[in-house]
């Protein structure tokens, strides 16, 4: 393996060029930067940067790992990698849909046409014929497991953000993808943020070239402050933690775009409230755990996993291109979102551990380094600034710990052992993750599955893990999910939907024990039954943050009802899904959209629909209502309102509540009544809206918009894209693209009749 260390002393200017300074075989070298034409690329800039130049000069084929700071031009390196591996299809994979679509736009200019697999249902209907494909990790691993043609023709594979392998939830998928690349001999380029022990990662992927880059396109200046000392600069006397955070920022007096990383999400919301109430800032967020005051000052926002996805995307765009200059965030923003800033401010808590005799920090040291990676905007900032504000430890203790962190060994979540976690869809979360991890290779290689699994980094580091996997295979064989050495057709179906056999067992248990509940309370009964098929954690703390005691009380009532009716102990956060599915967020004026993971259930509902159609345990009328209730958060009897464009969660639930008030049996009856302008229904809708809107003017506007949307509705109801996707199960992809919504519904009703038995 050739190892290159790109040094900080490298220089780069977009117009003037610069130089690459690096160490190779213990010798320091200095070279001029390459021009795009020299490497066969037609690009709108004059020079490749030092990292790109060094990669092109030293990469001669095979696998490679690049470990470098954020925003150092790794995307272009993907194309340079392709130029030396032109045989076969070029595949780029990353963890998030936003990154996938960002790369789609970048690569389109080079390849002309680019295939996409981001989890969207319509994409699955399109056959991939393009030379290049961008895909999320999950879409790519599904293609690999099923031997999809576009994966089998891979000639070059780029795994971006490969450091996500350290994550408990998704790390196993990256290990699986790398094992397939190694097994099939697919040239692999792994792109990583700066991580400790990256050399171990390079050895694992059998890299011919490893570049460890210390160079940043925009130089970083780090400053560490003690919070107590910093607050002496301000005239006010802040008392609460959130007041201290905002006062510290005022003391720093930063200009330009600033990301403020906080160790706790509640502190983020509280700081936002202080900014709004006492500093006159205008809050960009719409879904909030407090009542916002209308202000006209500078914009401010908070970004974390609790914020609805649609709002997160708006906030990101406003920070990139708009007038939003101060954005509070938690550590989720440090990974997977391309959002550079002029400055980052990182609030860190430290404590001295008497057992290890060393300081512990939160957020952890690697996350702090990732957060620093957001500092500096190429072409806009001459320098990026990292301001670390610490409590509970001395400044030099943190500085020393950050240096030592980069010298530690590389670890993954699997190699260290998985933790049990409340809220998992199955009783045994660890078995569930491990079963899916091994069933992928079993699906692809049959009896040779061990050979691929032995290539997993975690198995190499922890050989006892292989023994655990062997025991799980034996158990799955006893349970009937593996016959001989082959997974059954049911097992293949489950794995293609990312559902473990253990989750399926839990589903069957609920199916048998909720018959009466599904008849009496269909929203509660069906959502509880299918909950094991949904991968999301559905954190109750997120819901409680926005709804306070109301959810705590309602959640307890839901759990008691479920346990009484089914005899099953509820510990998978089913109450969150049911609270959402009943439309309960409508009662909270501070909530514009369902928060957190509840705003990202579209892909989950599509996979759920595919699985339920293939299982054929319910007729399609039931399946359709269940998946739309999951997708849109509208009660079972009115859930098809979720397919009406322009309604969304709040308007859909306003209609559903009006329908319930007048005794409408379903959404079709309700829609017809609105179209016919039946006074009883229209008055009921106004009554429902009056609960949410105190302004008569706003109420009338919302009422008129809902009525206008409903009057344009055409029957039959249903999301055409989703229905075509589901119908493709029975008529094939090409035919599904040709048929209309009516025909798709006809196909589904003919084939999904609930005739199978378990």
Predicted feature locations:
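Conserved segment of the helicase C-terminal RecA-like domain
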Residues: 343, 358-403
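C-terminal helical accessory/scaffold domains
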Residues: 461, 470-653
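Conserved C-terminal RecA-like helicase domain
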Residues: 69, 91-120, 254, 259-326, ...
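Conserved helix/coil segment N-terminal to the catalytic DExD/H
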Residues: 121-155
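SF2 helicase catalytic motif II
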Residues: 138-139, 147-188
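Helicase-associated low-complexity/disordered flanking segments
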Residues: 1-54, 61-64, 269, 280-297, ...
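Conserved interdomain linker/interface between the two RecA-like ATPase lobes of SF2 helicase motors
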Residues: 179, 195-275, 301, 305
